[in-house]
Amino acid sequence: MKNYQQLWQSLTPLYDAGEAQAIVRTVLDAEYGMTLTDIIGGKVNELSADEGKKLEEIITRLQKGEPVQYVLGQADFAGRTFHVEPGVLIPRPETAELCQWIAETQNENLKKEEAIIREEFSISPDVALEDVNLFEGKGWFKRKYLRLRFLVKMLHSYKKARHTKLASPRPRIIDLGTGSGCIAITLSLDIPNSEVVGFDISDSACNVATKNAKQLASKAIFYKFDIFDMPEKCKTDRKNHLKADIIVSNPPYICEKEKADMEKNVLDYEPDLALFVPDEDPLKFYRAIAEFASLELRSWGMLYFEINPLYEKETREMLEGFGFKDIETKEDSFGKKRMMRAVKS
């Protein structure tokens, strides 16, 4: 049986030393519950014959370039563990940053709106005293009038607060191209009282997403649907209107010409359908989603994308063409323009 150093060194033809070590540590943790202290202490050498055989099989698959997430059948995302399998895109850290941006924006806006409502609903002592002094000593009719006046003020304050359109306390969220369900499930768990629906064209993806929702106690639900059919169905049949507060998507956005710069294990194992777009039409999915969002978002609803940094300008202009406003781009932790948000007017 190979020791820890021999295990990670066997992967260096494909990965640098740091990445090879991280992969082997991930395997030892997921399969055998070993901590870094256990590994340094030589616990790898204490594996049984059956455990050692299984580890060798895992290393053999890794040596062929198969992603460790597919080998283990799981991937960590936003502090949770998701089931993944071939045919479903492996969740990326950058996508977790998109989820964090959405959840933080929603929760912050909800707090702002609640503060506005509290402020608007509070009647100042001066106003209250004015009302009391005006009708003090008056009869039953005057007291009734005072109550009515107070209620009218309250109603006006409520309408004024709700007119801010900052956030819905029970937001409806649609995730298009849901894959493993990582975005939909994360938002359903991180945004209280949210109603989340995910769509994907792949049966396999919908099945995996449903499995993850059950495993993680999420109420997100998933359906098979083609993004390119959705705008037309919304136009022709009112029954298909979903009316969301938030629509989010991490659609395919890598051009064929970019393949030369990609890792072999991604090209060989992850689904092309979830990754690539034609060189001549890099915004193919974004246009369909933007059109759908222009129909299905409520007024002041928000559309979020993970984007290709190479086409940030074109994506922004496309959204402006569909009437979106307040378009904002956000960099990921690697300093790339990876996320975009737009508001429906």
How should these model regions be labeled?
Residues 6, 10, 26, 54-57, ...:
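Alpha-helical elements of Rossmann-like donor-binding domains used by nucleotide-donor carbohydrate transfer enzymes
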Residues 1-77:
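N-terminal auxiliary segments of SAM/dcSAM-dependent transferases
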Residues 1-9, 148, 234-237, 345:
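Short, low-complexity, intrinsically disordered N-terminal peptides in bacterial proteins
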Residues 31, 35, 43, 62, ...:
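A general structural signal marking secondary-structure boundaries and capping sites
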